[in-house]
């Protein structure tokens, strides 16, 4: 079946046809590194990580670009407020973002370009746009003339004359208030670079147009980002790139937000939850399940209850995996192919919720096989489950999740040794028919957050939902 994606520019789901057979090129608007990431920031990277994994499963060679905006009004403002170099703030938060992507199992991008490393490409794009009458210089600033580009606002389906005029932000010399800055003239205390129009720094929109062209050429398959980027950022990217002569992106894919009390999670609103804090409270694989399993175009309303539900749901999957591994006496390799129903769901606009339902159905079938002592059927179901979880980045047997944190594997071994000692005491009590003591030990372990299951191979323990 052909992969189908919702294309924002077409406002409908379209069959995906790659520019080059067997290859997929993706540009994802990455982090503006003025602060450490909250889970809303990371959701976008995680959604497109699942997209990438699915294309790779389907046999495509994927080139995945995720940029870093390391110079920006907010970074400069924070530099002034905190008395720290702008580049130090950017680098510190870039590392925090990469830590967030890594801890939640996102594959590294093919390239991760920084805006400040591509000033030459930006200057060349501005020079061409000025020569073609699409941009102009005024008081050291370079603006894009939106009326020179008739296709402007087609992505967001707006009319230019109905567009609210921006407040201005101190910009001077504009021909039209809706023209946007490609280059900002130097101001005291700000970082600057030399250009034919004087020293200054790049505008946000120019950065992405130039970097997409540098790494993916004049045309590429998919441009991604959050819904909030459709206007003005992606509209302005399109205007610059197409006026420059690029075909630019052929599909536009946007993910929905994480919300809190119905509002988009945002540091400025004070309703954000940092990834670094979340992983202290929740296992990273549970966070990935929580953020990655809703459909990418559906909002996620943040709540502790929803996280606990995700934890319980994943525990059912993980428990099945552990039981079959014990039954099989070793690791069961994933199937080379996922079940057809799972593939059909993923091909249909990355239908992760429907695909996940197939995972849970297969887990139930596997549990029934275990209950019937049908080892062969249980192993076959686990192989299918591992194949599906691998596509979603949720296979608990993947080395990515071994330990889940600093020294996690060592810690698990220590805890296992201690719990086994207690379970041995419980087994001794059961052998003496001292049921009261055996039950008391089990209850104490349960109160500690452990689930004890008695099996023909002896007792085993797992972490229970909180």
UniProtKB/Swiss-Prot annotation:
Motif, 'HIGH' region: chain positions: 31-41
Co-factor(s): Zn(2+)
Positions of ATP binding: 267
Domain of life: Bacteria
Entry keyword set: Aminoacyl-tRNA synthetase, ATP-binding, Cytoplasm, Ligase, Metal-binding, Nucleotide-binding, Protein biosynthesis, Zinc
Chain residues that bind Zn(2+): 29, 208, 233, 237
Substrates-to-products reaction catalysed: tRNA(Cys) + L-cysteine + ATP = L-cysteinyl-tRNA(Cys) + AMP + diphosphate
Localisation per UniProt entry: Cytoplasm
Cofactor annotation comment: Binds 1 zinc ion per subunit.
A Pfam family hit: DALR_2
InterPro entries: Cys-tRNA-ligase (IPR015803), Cys-tRNA-synt_Ia_DALR (IPR015273), Cys-tRNA/MSH_ligase (IPR024909), CysS_C (IPR056411), Rossmann-like_a/b/a_fold (IPR014729), tRNA-synt_1_cat_dom (IPR032678), tRNAsynth_Ia_anticodon-bd (IPR009080)
Keyword Zinc on entry: yes
Listed Gene3D superfamilies: Cysteine-tRNA ligase, C-terminal anti-codon recognition domain (1.20.120.1910), HUPs (3.40.50.620)
Listed GO CC annotations: cytosol
Self-association state and partner proteins as the record states: Monomer.
Name the UniProt record assigns to this protein: Cysteine--tRNA ligase
Organism of derivation: Streptomyces avermitilis (strain ATCC 31267 / DSM 46492 / JCM 5070 / NBRC 14893 / NCIMB 12804 / NRRL 8165 / MA-4680)
Lineage: Bacteria, Bacillati, Actinomycetota, Actinomycetes, Kitasatosporales
Gene assigned in the entry: cysS
